[in-house]
Regions:
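NAD(P)+-binding Rossmann beta1-loop-alpha1 motif at the extreme N-terminus of oxidoreductases
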Residues: 1-67, 127, 161-162
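Rossmann-fold NAD(P) dinucleotide-binding segment
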Residues: 54-116
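Rossmann-fold dinucleotide-binding core
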Residues: 97-177
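Active-site-proximal catalytic alpha-helix in oxidoreductases
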Residues: 132-139, 161, 165-197, 208-220, ...
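Interdomain hinge/lid region at the active-site interface
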Residues: 214-278
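NAD(P)-dependent dehydrogenase/reductase Rossmann-like domain
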Residues: 271-291
Length: 291
């Protein structure tokens, strides 16, 4: 008999789907739910129990992963599932929903299921590393009470870092995403300048490779730019949401660069790039896109 905890995954988008897949590969019993029922059907052949409602998905779960689009969706679903959860279950909120929404979710769970444990656990990484279990889990909350979640995190990640009380890891995730967003804007602008001056993205990477600026992320995004394939690893709309969450926590006037990027990316989203990978901002910057 397996000693692994039973897991429910709520939200089977790019990240939730990867989590469920890796859990199944590691022998976990996994139930899943998604607003769009077709998501996750491919995992049923590998053992996923797909449910029509989130309440059904969590009924037997000892560890619940929530990976929903934003704070509003997270709070809505949490209110629905809490009465249906096992009293001692561990609720792992793994989306980037911001600090006020995290505090609301903690209070809501405490009100509806006071014996449950809330673990705040956003991740560093996007779709491709998630599929390879190479993300980093940024966890916060009562680690002792949340011990049953640790083998779950181990199955979906390269490791877990703990940051004290629940909510602290939301803060760290927004710090990391502010850096990522700023980096992506720099990559896109540098690639545009290179193009104007007659260089390809591959030539730009060759000049960077081996030096201090040659981060693997830069290579991945320059490859996307070179191929003009912007299949979302992280949707521009989601990155824009995270930029705004980061700005909401910053001291006034301390992040003028990110403020400008958020304004630009809103224009890109309005121009039809919201569902593309955030690297599609390169394409939006092209003079031809504004012709």
């Amino acid at each position: 008999m397996s000693t692994l905890p039973k897991v429910a995954v709520l939200g089977l988008g790019a990240m939730g789907h990867a989590f469920a897949s890796n859990l199944l590969k590691n022998g976990f019993t996994v139930a899943g739910w998604n607003r769009s029922p077709a998501r996750g059907e491919d995992l049923q052949a590998h053992g996923l129990s797909l449910h029509a409602t989130p309440q059904q998905a969590v009924a037997d779960a000892e560890v619940i992963i929530s990976m929903l689009a934003d704070g509003e969706a997270t709070l809505e679903v949490l209110a629905q599932i809490a009465p249906a959860c096992q009293p001692q279950a561990i609720y792992c909120q793994m989306g980037t929903i911001g600090l006020p929404e995290t505090r609301q979710a903690i209070a809501l769970l405490r009100e509806l299921q006071p014996a449950m444990t809330y673990i705040d656990a956003p991740v560093s990484g996007t779709k491709a590393p998630a599929e390879k279990a190479q993300i980093l889990v940024l966890a916060s909350g009562d680690r002792e009470k949340g011990a049953a979640a640790e083998p779950v995190f181990a199955a979906i990640s390269r490791g877990t870092q703990w940051f004290g009380e629940a909510g602290n890891s939301q803060k760290m995730k927004l710090v990391l995403n502010a850096r990522l967003i700023s980096m992506m804007q720099g990559i896109a602008e540098s690639a545009q300048l290179a193009k104007t001056l007659g260089f390809t993205p591959d030539q730009l990477w060759s000049a960077l490779e081996g030096g201090p600026l040659a981060a693997p992320y830069v290579k991945v995004k320059l490859d996307a730019i070179a191929s003009e394939q912007f299949t979302p690893q992280m949707q521009l709309a989601h990155a824009l949401k995270d930029a705004r969450l980061a700005l909401s926590l910053a001291e006034p006037h301390t992040m003028p660069g990110l403020e400008t990027i958020a304004e630009l990316w809103q224009q890109a989203a309005d121009a039809g790039y919201a569902g593309e990978d955030l690297s599609a901002v390169y394409q939006w910057l092209s003079p031809s896109s504004k012709a």
